[in-house]
Amino acid sequence: MARKYEIMYIIRPNIEEDEKKAVVERFDGILTENGAEIIESKEWGKRRLAYEINDYRDGFYHIVKLNADKADSINEFDRLAKISDDIVRHMVIKEEA
């Protein structure tokens, strides 16, 4: 049975527009390649952070809603987001059925 997840991640603010699109496409691709079905992937815009992260005071928020049967896609996203220089913070939420 597919579970619903929501992923929110913050992209560094000093990124070029085309690079930002490439980051979003790359991470959406990671999810779909590992068996997830993306329901919605939307940009939330540039927002001020509640506190400074890696010397950044703001960042580009992006939200992805998806269905996944197994946690493989979520685990791979989590692993790669942790080592990516473009993503300063991310959070995965499993939605209630």
Curated annotation (Swiss-Prot):
PROSITE patterns reported in the protein's UniProt record: RIBOSOMAL_S6
UniProt keyword terms in alphabetical order: Ribonucleoprotein, Ribosomal protein, RNA-binding, rRNA-binding
Protein name, per record: Small ribosomal subunit protein bS6
Gene3D superfamilies: 3.30.70.60
InterPro entries: Ribosomal_bS6, Ribosomal_bS6_CS, Ribosomal_bS6_sf, Ribosomal_S6_plastid/chlpt, Transl_elong_EF1B/ribsomal_bS6
SS bond list: none
Source organism (scientific name): Listeria welshimeri serovar 6b (strain ATCC 35897 / DSM 20650 / CCUG 15529 / CIP 8149 / NCTC 11857 / SLCC 5334 / V8)
Top-level taxon of the source organism: Bacteria
Gene: rpsF
Family that this chain belongs to: Belongs to the bacterial ribosomal protein bS6 family.
GO molecular function, one term: structural constituent of ribosome
Function: Binds together with bS18 to 16S ribosomal RNA.
Gene Ontology, cellular component aspect: cytoplasm; ribonucleoprotein complex; ribosome
One Pfam family cited in the UniProt record for this chain: Ribosomal_S6
Lineage: Bacteria, Bacillati, Bacillota, Bacilli, Bacillales
Gene Ontology terms describing biological process: translation
Endpoints of the signal sequence: none
